[in-house]
Amino acid sequence: PPRSTLFPYTTLFRSDVDGVKVKGTKFAVYAPSATAVSVIGDFNFWDGRRLPMAKSLLGHWVLFVPGLGAGLRYKYEIKDPFGNRLPHKADPVGFYHEQYPSFASIISDHRTYTWHDAEWQKSQLGNKLERPMSIYELHMGSWKKSENGQPLTYRELAVDLLDYVKNMGYTHIELMPIMEHPFSGSWGYQPTGLFAPTSRFGTIDDFKFFVDTFHQNGIGIILDWVPAHFPTDAFGLAKFDGTCVYEYEDPRRGWHPDWNSLIYDFGRDTVRRFLIASALIWLDLYHIDGLRVDAVASMLYWDYSRKEGEWIPNVDGGNINYEAVSFLKWFNEEVNRKHPNAVTIAEESTAFTGVSRPTSTGGLGFNFKWNMGWMHDSLEYMQTDPFFRKYHHGEMSFSMIYAYNENFILSISHDEVTHGKHSLLYKMPGDEWQQAANLRAYLGYQYAHPGKKLNFMGSEFGQGSEWNDNAQLDWWLLKYPKHQGVQKLVQDLNEMYKKEPALWKRDYDPDAFRWLDVNDAEHSIFAMLRSGDDGDCIMAVSNFTPVPYVAYRLGVPTPGTYKVILNTDDKKYWGSGYGTGSDEIVASNISYQNNYHSIVLDLPPIDRKS
């Protein structure tokens, strides 16, 4: 792999021994307080007496072992400052690891794969904010199972998942963490191998093939990356050399009460370099297109999920973790400097200022931020009985008050369809038909609203049950017209979205959006206008009631003919086919709603009407 100036790691190596070039493996591990470190593995009967390592002044232990090549298992035997032998440790910067029960690291060779995605890399040049992004979030282990009930491998997913995502029209996929992790029930959010794709689904080359194949078919890949915390497994980073090498020593800073995990010491230079080296490896070695940083809010606040007296204030007496702020800025600067085409995305659940603003202006430097406020408010509105929605009208429109404070992604993620929250379909009120109609209307509203798009797997066809990470999606539902209709709608929304620059080119330009009607709470109607370049416009009108509105007048800014390009109530989507009166609507010179022109159209209901 490429040399890292940030953190040393074990690598295949060619060394000079008495003037002769000798192939082997150079091991390197950071354990500054250890009194002894040895490499143990298949090659020395796991005997710590055979291959002791030498300690550098900086606290790194290194050893070159001739003749060792890829595929051999290894760990480190470490003695703490008092000479006590610790549980055998996996390599913190290992590129490949075994599964339970050993969790051993495996020597890897990154020179065996040849990439074929040069055209994709060239295509990613340019302004990241002015591109369409419709992201399909998924959990690799539960998207689909093989006939024997096992998760699909990287290479199987490179066929089945690719075909599906490409056919559905998504621009990107986002993978819930595939960094190596011991506990499947963590969904990957408690990783121990920040440099390694999990071996659950195949080899390193298999994962590279997966990424490469998606790129060759024009689809980007974003990874969830977890620098906020790590698990306490004895073979992992916890008390790595008998002391707190990676975590804060004081549990008021180093222990996460929500997840029973340990928090990285963001003020320690070696920890910062370790984490940023991990981020860059995914972009360097695995050609990943972006990283979504998980649980940013838990990093930013000392008092996150802590009661009074359970946290230590910063030097100014406040609750902001300046060390984490500094780390996140450096992370974004390094990614932008070394991989300017890559995107960084923050899952940040508070109103922290400037998350997606440049570090040069005081921001954290992310390219995008999940809009969790929009997600919460809009879902709360959609779960309200349509009869009472008029009293909650502002929940659906409030997002535009702050829409341009950040570069938002409208995310409806895995967090919304688990832990008793119901599937997206079953959040909707009403009978079977009304639930589907509400879901289709909601998805249409999401695609019309400014901001990039993200939806979790299963939502695109109206998954009925909550997401279960131990089972595959309910693919059998697609034999029913209702679910076929939702899936067809999402497919058409994606294709329309990509073809219409007005829906993405100026997502973050306030001059490219205006409400045409945002005050009709009585009828629960919203109408918006999105503008692209050269006068290109898209108008979206939403009726969130079970009542059809005939000859509904709407003010428009320009004369001419307005063409209906998508109707979520179309029969092909399992809608009623109520229609809008005409597929082409000519604007009149009748002034209305502070516009010089207006159109008249019929608005379909979220109910079965003929």
Predicted regions and their residues:
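Alpha-helical packing segments of well-folded alpha/beta enzyme cores
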Residues: 160-161, 206, 210, 271-282, ...
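Short, flexible loop/turn elements at secondary-structure junctions
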Residues: 31-33, 57, 67, 139-144, ...
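Conserved, mostly hydrophobic/aromatic
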Residues: 29, 76, 138, 165, ...
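A short acidic, glycine-rich active-site loop
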Residues: 196-200, 315-322, 431-433, 477-484
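Carbohydrate-interacting/catalytic domains
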Residues: 8-131, 155-165, 169, 433-436, ...
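Conserved alpha/beta catalytic core and glycan-binding cleft of carbohydrate-active enzymes
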Residues: 287-289, 304-472, 498-554, 558-569, ...
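Substrate-binding/active-site clefts of carbohydrate-active enzymes
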Residues: 95-96, 118-130, 139-319, 601
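Short, exposed "boundary/linker" segments that immediately precede the start
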Residues: 1-5
